[in-house]
Amino acid sequence: MPRIGTPLSPTATRVLLCGSGELGKEVVIELQRLGCEVIAVDRYPNAPAMQVAHRNHVISMLDGAALRAVIEQEKPHYIVPEIEAIATATLVELEAEGYTVIPTARAAQLTMNREGIRRLAAEELGLPTSPYRFADSYEDYAAAVAALGFPCVVKPIMSSSGKGQSLLRGPDDVKKAWDYAQEGGRAGKGRVIVEGFIDFDYEITLLTVRHAGGTTFCAPVGHRQEKGDYQESWQPQPMSAKAIAESERIALAVTGALGGRGLFGVELFIKGDMVWFSEVSPRPHDTGLVTLISQDLSEFALHARAILGLPIPAIRQVGPSASAVILVEGESTQPSFSNLGAALAEPDTALRLFGKPEVKGQRRMGVALARDESIEAARAKALRAAQAVKVEL
């Protein structure tokens, strides 16, 4: 069985997080509950996970030399990517040198961009996906749109939180969607994926955890997106037995191909009993924030256990639950939050304020959580709590 040492001593079990956002913050808390020494790394100071870690470093994680220098200095037992935008070639090298990357360096590399994971799912594993084409130039992109027809979706192959993503309904959308995709990609201008639109009933995240004892699934998480960015999520999403079985089959295939240990967020489109693979994150998923109130072990606790090789004998879902994000728009380096008493006045509600050091434009700064007798009631309660929070910039 795994052994965990004493933090800040020669026996410490050191975990280094690449990325220090709100999801990483919860992972740090869970790792510290299990006695780990945690180092948080990100491109800006005072990031949420840094505020609860033992130490932190500020570097560009796309700079392979800087990333290697920090890892060689800290000598972590586990390297845990929390975001996609990392010098994954360096992670591959470090893994070959004996470091443990969660879940694997290959998983981080394949999921860093939409092309790697789409080709794995559709072409290697033969899983159902939307029809798709990749394009490097405007001419190729226009040809892809013409081939797939309207409506269709365009996304940069490297972006997160819906940045650069558009739904094209007709010819008038073609040029502006291309321009928006070129602005929204993490690596600047470049390659896009054009996908045929699936007329789905709903979309889910199937949180799938690969751990010492095998693979375990959480109850499906339903969610609502705006411009590709999560606004609210709920668990359990009602589904047919056939759709659940097919979702688990697809998630098992994808996570099995990526390998390693840890929690994965597998995104799927559902129509009746039919299921299509969309994307996968080899780490906790933003829509899974609902598990902070909906499960006895949150997605973050599950990730921590899986990383450390600890057993997950069961996951208990505690009833209809929902999350609603607290979005803030404007500019500030010292936002403050009030009316929290009203937000927490109803039973079975909770808040997480992420502690992000600044707002520039629109930013997710917290989440409201709620449980109730039905999904509809839980969603309404979470939205009331989120809307009650007042923000001063």
Swiss-Prot record:
Keywords for this protein: ATP-binding, Ligase, Magnesium, Metal-binding, Nucleotide-binding, Purine biosynthesis
Keyword Ligase found: yes
One MF annotation (Gene Ontology) recorded for this entry: phosphoribosylglycinamide formyltransferase activity
Catalytic activity: N(1)-(5-phospho-beta-D-ribosyl)glycinamide + formate + ATP = N(2)-formyl-N(1)-(5-phospho-beta-D-ribosyl)glycinamide + ADP + phosphate + H(+)
Entry EC no(s): 6.3.1.21
GO CC term (a single one): cytosol
Cytoplasm among keywords: no
One record GO biological process: 'de novo' IMP biosynthetic process
Stated family: Belongs to the PurK/PurT family.
Subunit structure: Homodimer.
Name assigned to this protein: Formate-dependent phosphoribosylglycinamide formyltransferase
Organism the protein comes from: Azoarcus sp. (strain BH72)
Lineage per the UniProt record: Bacteria, Pseudomonadati, Pseudomonadota, Betaproteobacteria, Rhodocyclales
The gene coding this protein: purT
